[in-house]
């Protein structure tokens, strides 16, 4: 830690740091905001879904509670659960289906599959996992970053992500969230 920051307890630390901005904001598109400014591009099919970590592997999006006792009070815009789920869905659609120029890896397809499972979309979940198996897994079931490369790179992430996505789907046969 910074030598100038002296705290004796978690409460003291919380009192010294600037309150964090709300963890979530919705763009005019409407999609989840990834940056502090509106720079979302619906054509950006980049493989990372860091702005959707609250959807998967987290649960802050599907279990969103808009009550002031949870979200706090202040000048930030308040959202309801339906708006949050819709924005996460739009963001996931904007990031593509794993066929974009930056989508060679199996792990991102497994992550997308798990995110679709969280949203209760079984057909897209199945498409993503089937596509990952077809495009990124060898006969020995090792995941390769780019199987068409003459010297392909083994990448374990998809091997862990695939069963994790299946477990999410098994846990969420219809919907992982209840619209209240």
PLM region spans:
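Active-site core of glycosidic bond-cleaving carbohydrate-active enzymes
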Residues: 1-179
């Amino acid at each position: 830690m910074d030598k100038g920051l002296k705290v004796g307890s978690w409460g003291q630390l919380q009192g010294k740091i600037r309150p964090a901005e709300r963890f979530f904001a919705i763009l005019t598109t409407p999609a989840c905001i990834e940056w502090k400014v509106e720079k979302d591009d619906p054509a950006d099919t980049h493989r990372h879904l860091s702005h959707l970590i609250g959807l998967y592997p987290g649960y802050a999006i599907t279990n969103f509670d808009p009550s002031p006792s949870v979200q706090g009070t202040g000048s930030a815009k308040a959202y309801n659960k339906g708006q949050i789920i819709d924005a996460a869905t739009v963001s996931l659609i904007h990031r593509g289906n794993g066929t974009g120029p930056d989508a060679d890896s199996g792990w991102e397809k497994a992550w997308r599959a798990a995110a679709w499972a969280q949203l209760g979309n079984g057909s897209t979940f199945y498409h993503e996992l089937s596509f990952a198996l077809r495009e990124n897994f060898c006969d020995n079931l090792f995941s390769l970053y780019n199987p068409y490369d003459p010297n392909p790179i083994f990448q374990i992430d998809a091997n862990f992500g695939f069963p994790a996505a299946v477990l999410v789907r098994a846990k969420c046969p219809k919907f992982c969230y209840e619209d209240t």
